[in-house]
């Protein structure tokens, strides 16, 4: 492949794993270069402002982890959200062209499968029988917390055994 350079990459169209979404759903398409701060700013503004009751974070390839991170941060900041997660593989098509045209090499097309994730966060209850369903957890401020998880513990001095 040292005699080729990448000319482009196209994600082949695939049906949405969540076709039954309400029309007012905010769809956040996370890319590898997306800034989490910008994504969260818009999603939290709409959820907390009441203009959106559903938010979908979707990402594929290297952005899949970033999409999950965004959804987890939103769940911490907005308690009581129901979650539905769908995983799939999407097909991408990469085009490669020869670096020098006089080598007699042909252009290449490479198809690959990349992981993709869709995370739906909703203020309204979702179908608990659907795969990937997660009910809202208890707000983090309620309930007793174990002493071991309350932050760093003071260091104990080692006992001097010289005497």
From Swiss-Prot:
One example of the protein's molecular function in GO is:
RNA binding
Q: Which Pfam families match?
A: Alba
Which compartments is it annotated to reside in? Nucleus
Q: Where is the composition biased (Basic residues)?
A: 154-163
Q: Which InterPro entries match?
A: Alba-like_dom_sf, Alba-like_NAB, DNA/RNA-bd_Alba-like
Q: Which family does it belong to?
A: Belongs to the histone-like Alba family.
Summarizing the function annotation, the protein's role is: May be a component of ribonuclease P or MRP.
Q: What is this protein called?
A: Ribonuclease P protein subunit p25-like protein
- As recorded in Swiss-Prot or TrEMBL, the protein's gene is named RPP25L
């Amino acid at each position: 492949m040292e005699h080729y350079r990448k000319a482009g990459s196209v994600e082949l169209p695939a049906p949405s794993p969540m076709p039954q979404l309400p029309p007012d759903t905010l769809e956040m398409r996370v890319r590898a270069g997306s800034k989490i701060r910008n994504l969260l700013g818009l999603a939290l503004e709409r959820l907390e402002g009441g203009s959106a009751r559903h938010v979908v974070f979707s990402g594929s390839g290297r952005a899949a982890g970033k999409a999950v991170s965004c959804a987890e941060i939103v769940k911490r900041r907005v308690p009581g959200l129901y979650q539905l997660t769908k995983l799939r593989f999407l097909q991408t098509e990469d085009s490669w062209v020869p670096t020098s045209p006089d080598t007699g090499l042909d252009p290449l097309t490479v198809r690959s499968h990349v992981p993709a994730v869709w995370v739906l966060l909703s203020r309204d209850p979702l179908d608990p029988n659907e795969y990937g369903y997660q009910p809202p957890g208890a707000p983090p401020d309620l309930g007793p917390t174990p002493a071991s998880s309350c932050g760093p513990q003071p260091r104990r001095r080692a006992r001097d055994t010289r005497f």
